[in-house]
Amino acid sequence: MTDTQNRVAMGYIKGVFGIKGWLKIAANTEYSDSLLDYPEWHLVKDGKTVSVTLEAGKVVNSELQVKFEGINDRDLAFSLRGYTIEIPREAFAPTEEDEYYWTDLVGMTVVNKDHTVLGKVSNLMETGANDVLMIDGEHGQILIPFVSQYIETVDTGSKIITADWGLDY
């Protein structure tokens, strides 16, 4: 697997703040400040990748703001607007048993106990009570709560999720 294939999009640069190179970040993470756990970021736009090192970061009024080493003025910061933020998957903290990163579930094939393919996980959504798998396939979109009552196994090696879910639900 190449370095590019092993990176996960975690958000994007949505704008600048001030005149000293600070950037506003739209994070696609549960907690926006969790991006501050990763000192090295890859910024990607139009096939171009720029590797940057995080110098500082803070959350201001629920908005993540960051400063990169070597980006010291508004013009340089502005040139990074619209770049997608990617982090190497191997930089993620290990998960506990029966705990998964959403990015690891997206793309997995979901089958039911009868081995009928329900489709592939296209996304997940947070409902407050639990996460829900959004599955797209030939049967249309199917939503399955990601709880042990319905999810029997998650095999990350074979990329198959087995669910106790019928086509008539």
From Swiss-Prot:
Q: Where is the signal peptide?
A: none
Record domain PRC barrel: where: 97-169
Q: Which SUPFAM superfamilies match?
A: PRC-barrel domain, Translation proteins
UniProt KW keywords: Chaperone, Cytoplasm, Ribosome biogenesis, rRNA processing
Gene3D superfamilies per the record? PRC-barrel domain, RimM
Q: What GO cellular component term, any one, is given?
A: cytoplasm
What terms describe the molecular function in GO for this protein? ribosome binding
Q: What does this protein do?
A: An accessory protein needed during the final step in the assembly of 30S ribosomal subunit, possibly for assembly of the head region. Essential for efficient processing of 16S rRNA. May be needed both before and after RbfA during the maturation of 16S rRNA. It has affinity for free ribosomal 30S subunits but not for 70S ribosomes.
Query: What HAMAP family does this protein's entry cite?
Result: Ribosome_mat_RimM (MF_00014)
Q: What is known of its domains?
A: The PRC barrel domain binds ribosomal protein uS19.
Task: Note the subunit structure.
Answer: Binds ribosomal protein uS19.
Record protein name field: Ribosome maturation factor RimM
